[in-house]
């Protein structure tokens, strides 16, 4: 059985004037335990809406979402969310304080939570930086602290909404490598949202391409059966997967552009 199951999921928003906006319609997807799944699509296609429903931040209008066979009833510790920016870090807390925050809220003893927090700070490559505050950290370091904070709560899966979008190209490439290393070390299931085809191929086991919104659903899935050495942009097999994904999303980009004019 898949760890995450979305069956015929729809999300409808109602405006103050009473009109309906269908963000997602009849969206179905299974994600296996330990899988890194990238959801790719144009701006406004409903990628974040899907993630928010899996996270439990938003309810479904129709359909069913299950994690570990159980219906989602709201946010829970089995699903950890890493956001795009660093606004979710508490500026008055050190890196250690940020990473252990969730454990402290759950009543974990100080010695245990500090030990666990330091373990995950080291795992994300920031050993010795635990005393620093967010204002003293670079953008990439802040994202690592976000990831460490989520991992410290030991969720079954990570939900990541374009977490590296605000980083410069060099830092973004570093964070992609670090994320792959961390996921290999922890065997976490990941749902990763992106609009970047290269990023999806570098990271994912499978890539799901969404139709352009509104009323979006999954258009198709591409398996990324590449060895690590083949995930370089210049490798022939990387280029072949890129073309396959690009062919699938090209028409959706055109549709999205038409709707903005």
Per-region residue spans from a language model:
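Conserved ABC ATPase signature
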Residues: 133-137, 141
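Conserved ABC ATPase "signature" region
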Residues: 100, 104, 111-129, 181
